[in-house]
């Protein structure tokens, strides 16, 4: 069961770019084959005679040849590169993985363009064609029919012809006639998306056509299961947009890359697959199966996981419940360029998963090692697709990501290159300082000591490794923890503040200084849910087919999900339990504690970040992070309004899948916003800080106020609330009641007769402009003078056919009456002008001329 949603929002930090290497394109782009050198297109000689056929082996692979045996035997003859393809490999599936080995300067675009980045992935087959040809076909597994004895199999095959992406003349046959020799030189030298950049990447990197005269083959090496091609490629480069905050425009010209292409033989013995379950969740490989449903088609999702198999001699031990070592453990190598002081922490972050795999019955199933030196292993290469690695990248990107490469036929994870960007440490410093410094004195300074930073690196390492094991984010894990337990020193230090390291619940910001909670209760760790998810995904179910084990896994899952700590919640922007950067089972209560800590931190920042001889950039950076944290707290509350709980179930499980968030919680969220946002947060406007980091401006607070108002009054949210009330008029929050409560909060001065400050007047105008925009959608409701971001999840709504415009007009009529009644008694001139202005705007909307 899948829930579809749309969203409009800025990207969230540390949200890895997982999807770049999660799936093989179902519609690969065609490659234009070379037209010379390899004889890849038939040619004629004047009188129409065709090119000569294969020559004797020794005439092609001469005594000058430098030969390398392996998966594909490679021969270099002068400036030609010949591939010798055994007949036994024809028709076999190969996975081609392309990476940047060395990147040009000043070309990176966000997360893309660094050494180690994957830039392409394809499944191909070599096959023998007519007229002494070898073809490369690009293979898609988007449709599937397993049983070749059924008529449906033939029908699917007729409608699923795989494209021929390249063709080569057979230059010679192997000495023993069991293989074919082709000239691969021109194909490597060409620009094609089988071996190099997929078209998707080029616009991001601003690169265009290949500069052939500035490109060449560096080397080709072959190993038992893979062949590695290393090239230098130069592309034309267009100038880029101005770099934000500067006058610098990246220049045009050329960009030169060192690229590596790995051609890997996929297993003939397919891994035992496991079907996806929404209640646990893994990354998936998907296809349409025409055999699974006799009365239709069925979309199949298989989880992606490593092939961990029991040694035959250990099967009896496993059945007795003893831990066994897998045939092939999961090994990650640490990039040799990684600063030495961080290597132990990165290794520990990997090894921390060993306990989780013990739940699946395996010991020593996963480990990290330092990459071997040239003296230890001259064949080891970071770009070699046989090896998984944590790749250290000299980047300003404050992030890390954990993609993986998998076999699209079964979901078997083959390798992973975790991207570790150097500047992630700045982000860790900022977040730990603003979330944990009230409890950890070591966080109250500009530069953390190595032990603290190392522990932060360790937890991010574990998080990214989790992605490479197949685990997505479990944003709802922390919602299983009662808020007050986050302040219980003994409990939280034992259990952690979230049961999953795959949650975005960085640090325990609920803990107060007086709680005296140590780092054991502040830092994320691999928790109960992670142990369960690894058990579910990796524990072998012996002597069962994929279909048969589904019933067994279902019984496991039904029992386990009775424990809220073992629950997976999908992030959909509508379920308030599954949000990023939040803690506890009630975000309003948790975030009140978080705000209390921010109020404690703010006045101390100038002292903590006082660096002799330095300017105030560090202070500005951390202050802006405080504002960002405050913004997160506000939007956590917003999600409760019109929120829907989603709990995926199978048909035999009791309870509903979709449940409206109780009205009492929605009202609590609105009260939280009224108190902490719509009433001016003067504590955040610390003059001692602001006078040092910026000219006077109101945008920091105003933009949050306006964006929250826009999200609360979005047609998507109001439309969803209308539908919720129609389904459940007991628990739902009716939109007229909600809008009236919001109006009373924002316009309370009409009753109290108190004067308004500039921030409060802004909020009131924002409310009115948002209401006007519901009536007249063309009205620009942004009141900040800049970009107004409205985050909304769900289907679009036609205002004219719902109660939304009716409620908006009714609210403005009532408000206009109240404003006109208040004007005569208003003594403050600015407040009076403000009320007169707003009254005019409402009147113009309700009574257009």
Stretch-by-stretch model annotation:
Residues 370-393, 455-512:
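The catalytic-center signature of Zn2+-dependent metalloproteases
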Residues 1-12:
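Bacterial N-terminal signal peptides that target proteins for export
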Residues 28-338, 356, 360, 371-426, ...:
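Auxiliary tRNA-acceptor-end handling modules of aminoacyl-tRNA synthetases
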Residues 90, 341-365:
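Zn2+-dependent metallopeptidase catalytic core
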Residues 332-343, 446-452, 488, 616:
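Second-shell loop/turn segments in exported
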Residues 478-849:
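Conserved catalytic/binding loops enriched for acidic/polar residues
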Residues 10-21:
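Bacterial N-terminal signal peptides
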């Amino acid at each position: 069961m899948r829930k579809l949603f749309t969203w409009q929002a800025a990207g969230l930090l540390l949200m890895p770019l997982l999807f770049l290497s999660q799936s093989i394109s179902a519609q690969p782009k065609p490659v234009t084959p070379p037209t010379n050198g390899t004889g890849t297109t038939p040619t004629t000689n004047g009188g129409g005679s065709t090119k000569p056929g294969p020559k004797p082996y020794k005439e092609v692979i001469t005594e000058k040849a430098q030969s390398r045996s392996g998966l594909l035997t490679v021969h270099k003859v002068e400036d030609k590169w010949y591939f010798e393809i055994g007949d036994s490999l024809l028709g076999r599936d190969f996975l081609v993985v392309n990476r940047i080995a060395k990147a040009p300067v000043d070309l990176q675009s966000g997360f893309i363009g660094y050494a180690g980045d994957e830039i392409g992935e394809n499944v191909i087959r070599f096959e023998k064609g007519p007229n002494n040809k070898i073809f490369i076909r690009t293979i898609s597994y988007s449709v599937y029919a397993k049983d070749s004895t059924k008529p449906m199999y033939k029908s699917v095959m007729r409608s699923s012809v795989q494209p021929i992406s390249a063709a080569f003349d057979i230059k010679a046959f192997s000495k023993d006639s069991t293989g074919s020799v082709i000239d691969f030189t021109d194909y490597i030298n060409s620009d094609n998306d089988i071996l190099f950049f997929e078209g998707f990447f080029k616009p991001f990197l601003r690169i265009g056509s290949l500069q052939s005269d500035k490109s060449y083959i560096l080397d080709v090496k072959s190993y038992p299961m893979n062949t590695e091609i290393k090239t230098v490629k130069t592309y034309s480069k267009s100038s880029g947009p101005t770099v934000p905050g500067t006058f610098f425009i990246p220049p045009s010209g050329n960009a030169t890359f060192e690229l590596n292409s790995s051609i890997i033989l996929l297993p003939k013995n397919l891994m035992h697959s496991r079907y996806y379950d929404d209640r646990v969740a893994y990354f998936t490989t998907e296809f349409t199966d025409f055999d699974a449903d006799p009365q239709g088609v069925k979309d199949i999702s298989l989880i992606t996981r490593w092939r961990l198999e029991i040694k035959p001699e250990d099967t009896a031990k496993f059945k007795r419940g003893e831990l066994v070592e897998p045939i092939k453990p999961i090994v990650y190598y640490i990039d040799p360029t990684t600063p030495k002081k961080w290597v132990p922490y990165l290794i520990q972050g990997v090894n921390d998963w060993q306990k989780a795999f013990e739940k699946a019955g395996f010991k020593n199933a996963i480990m990290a090692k330092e990459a071997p030196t040239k003296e230890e292993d001259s064949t080891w290469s970071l770009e070699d697709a046989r090896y998984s690695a944590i790749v250290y990248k000299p980047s300003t990107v404050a992030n890390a990501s954990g993609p993986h490469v998998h076999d699209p036929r079964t979901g078997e994870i083959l390798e992973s290159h975790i991207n570790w960007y150097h500047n992630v440490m700045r982000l860790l410093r900022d977040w730990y300082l603003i979330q944990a410094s009230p409890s950890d004195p070591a966080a109250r300074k500009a530069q953390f000591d190595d032990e603290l930073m190392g522990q932060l690196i360790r937890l991010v390492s574990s998080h990214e490794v989790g992605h490479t094991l197949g685990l997505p984010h479990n944003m709802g894990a922390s919602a299983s923890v009662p808020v007050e337990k986050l302040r219980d020193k003994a409990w939280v230090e034992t259990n952690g503040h979230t049961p999953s390291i795959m949650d975005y619940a960085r640090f325990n910001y609920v803990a107060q200084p007086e709680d005296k909670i140590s780092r054991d209760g502040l830092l994320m760790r691999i928790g109960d849910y992670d142990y369960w998810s690894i058990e579910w995904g990796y524990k072998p179910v012996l002597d069962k087919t994929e279909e048969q084990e589904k019933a067994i896994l279902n019984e496991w899952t039904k029992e386990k999900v009775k424990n809220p700590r073992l629950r997976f919640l999908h992030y959909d922007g509508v379920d308030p339990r599954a949000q990023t950067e939040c803690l506890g089972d009630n975000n309003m209560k948790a975030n009140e504690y978080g705000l209390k800590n921010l109020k404690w931190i703010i006045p101390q920042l100038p002292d903590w970040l006082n660096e002799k001889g330095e300017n105030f950039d560090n202070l500005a950076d951390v202050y802006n992070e405080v504002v960002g944290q405050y913004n997160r707290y506000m939007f956590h509350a917003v999600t409760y309004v019109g929120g829907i709980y989603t709990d995926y179930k199978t048909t035999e499980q009791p309870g509903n899948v979709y449940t409206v968030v109780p009205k009492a919680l929605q009202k609590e969220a609105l009260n939280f916003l009224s108190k902490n946002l719509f009433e001016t947060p003067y504590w955040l406007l610390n003059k001692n800080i602001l006078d040092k980091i910026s000219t006077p401006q109101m945008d920091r607070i105003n933009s949050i106020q306006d964006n929250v108002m826009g999200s609360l009054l979005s047609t998507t949210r109001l439309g969803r609330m209308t539908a919720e009330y129609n389904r459940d008029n007991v628990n739902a929050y009716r939109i007229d009641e909600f809008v009236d409560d919001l109006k009373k909060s924002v316009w309370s001065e009409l009753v109290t007769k108190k004067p308004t400050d500039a921030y409060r007047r802004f909020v009131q105008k924002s409310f009115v402009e948002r209401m006007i925009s519901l009536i007249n959608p063309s009205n620009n409701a942004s009141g900040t003078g800049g970009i107004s971001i409205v985050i909304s999840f769900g289907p679009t709504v036609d205002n004219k056919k719902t109660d939304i415009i009716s409620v908006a007009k009714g609210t403005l009529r009532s408000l206009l009456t109240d404003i006109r009644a208040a004007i005569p008694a208003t003594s403050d001139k600015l407040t009076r002008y403000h009320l007169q202005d707003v009254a005019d705007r409402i009147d113009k909307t309700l009574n257009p001329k």
